[in-house]
Amino acid sequence: YNQALMDLGATICTPQAPDCPVCPLTTTCQARDLGLQTQRPVLMPRPALPHITVTAAIIQRDSQVLITQRPPHGLLGGLWEFPGGKLQEGETLPDCLQREIREELDVTVEVGSQAGVYRHAYTHFRLTLHAFFCRLLSGEPRPLQVAALRWVQPAELGTYPMGKVDRQIALSLLKT
């Protein structure tokens, strides 16, 4: 019965052009009785997706770059990424990146030029990532809020599983 109703809606009673004269439900259709058949179904507006701004650091040492592994649980769990995090209210992008790197890796970085801006839409939110080239000022990276960290050659980045945005950053490094 359900499949038959769905077929009816897909072929005869379409939202933009219902074909009432050939519909087998004409005698029981309330929308037709009220003259509202072209106004059905009523589409509800979708709520706006939240937008999240994040930063990422491309920390270079010699010919290598630093990548970190996300904790195993949660969004993109276990994938590798360039370290960074969410922008907080009232924070500048460089301040955000310095704070996140300090919290995640216990090091201080100097934020340099912007490497790129990357956008991605997830199911429940939209993301804009600002990537910056950074230089270590003090400390040796330790995995405080990440599962692991590695210094890798840019050519090796393709061997690490990454989310789409981080993969775009990795590909851009191979082009430079």
Predicted regions located by residue number:
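The catalytic Nudix box helix
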Residues: F82-G116
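Catalytic cores of DNA base-excision repair glycosylases
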Residues: Y1-P21, L25-L34, D106-T108
